[in-house]
């Protein structure tokens, strides 16, 4: 990047703050770096985990949803602080595999409404492949935004937000915290020149 004379120092500084880990080595230093180890290596519980949520502006809530059949189904409730930082302030986590019982769309929608406890989210962001669950939520009056499915773009985006301190997690979201600390690159795929995460600890 430093070889690009068209970039001002201000822009270079912004780019440096956006990337970390393998993406920093590739995009900023111009090095080929294999994707290995912890994906969100910038995640720091001292910086990103909150015990006090008194600074939240409780007006516009959003829910992100990872809908699973065998894998876990997760709802995360997001709200902004006065500073503009987004905070994941509540989680719902249910693994049909661990509980040895799958739930229906109706049961998950009932769980969502109970979990929201009267909160009406602006939008629920959900994988477009969860078509039947989306239909159930729309029937109940929720506004749906279909999530983008590009995994690497999502990883880069979340890593950038973490690196710049623009998102944080409540300490009442133990599964989300665990997954941020446990999400790793697939080293066998990396040896073949393919960047992809291990399909584990990727639900929250």
Describe each PLM feature range.
Residues 1-2, 128:
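G-domain G4 guanine-recognition motif of GTPases
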Residues 19, 23, 197-204:
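Charged alpha-helix within mobile-element recombinases
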Residues 56-80:
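Gly/Thr-rich phosphate-binding beta-strand-loop-beta motif of the actin/hexokinase/Hsp70
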Residues 84-199:
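Mg2+-dependent endonuclease catalytic cores in nucleic-acid-processing enzymes, primarily RNase H-like
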Residues 28, 66, 75, 124, ...:
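A residue-level signal for conserved active-site and pocket-lining positions in enzyme catalytic cores
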């Amino acid at each position: 990047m430093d070889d690009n004379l068209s970039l001002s120092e201000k822009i270079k500084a912004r780019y440096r703050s956006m990337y970390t880990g393998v993406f920093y080595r590739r995009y900023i230093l111009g090095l080929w770096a294999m994707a290995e180890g912890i994906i969100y290596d910038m995640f720091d519980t001292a910086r990103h985990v909150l015990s006090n949520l008194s600074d939240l502006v409780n007006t516009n809530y959003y829910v992100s949803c990872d809908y699973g059949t065998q894998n876990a189904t997760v709802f995360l409730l997001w709200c902004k602080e006065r500073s503009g930082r987004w905070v994941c302030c509540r989680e719902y986590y249910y693994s049909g595999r661990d509980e040895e019982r799958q739930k229906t769309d109706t049961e998950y929608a009932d769980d969502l409404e109970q979990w929201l406890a009267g909160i009406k989210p602006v939008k629920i962001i959900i994988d477009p492949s969860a078509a039947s669950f989306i239909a159930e939520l729309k029937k109940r009056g929720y506004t749906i935004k279909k999530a983008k499915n590009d995994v690497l773009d999502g990883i880069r985006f979340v890593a950038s937000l973490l690196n710049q301190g623009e998102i944080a997690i409540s300490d009442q979201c133990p599964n989300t915290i665990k997954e941020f600390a446990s999400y790793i690159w697939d080293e066998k795929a990396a040896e073949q020149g393919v960047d992809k995460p291990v399909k584990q600890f990727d639900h929250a």
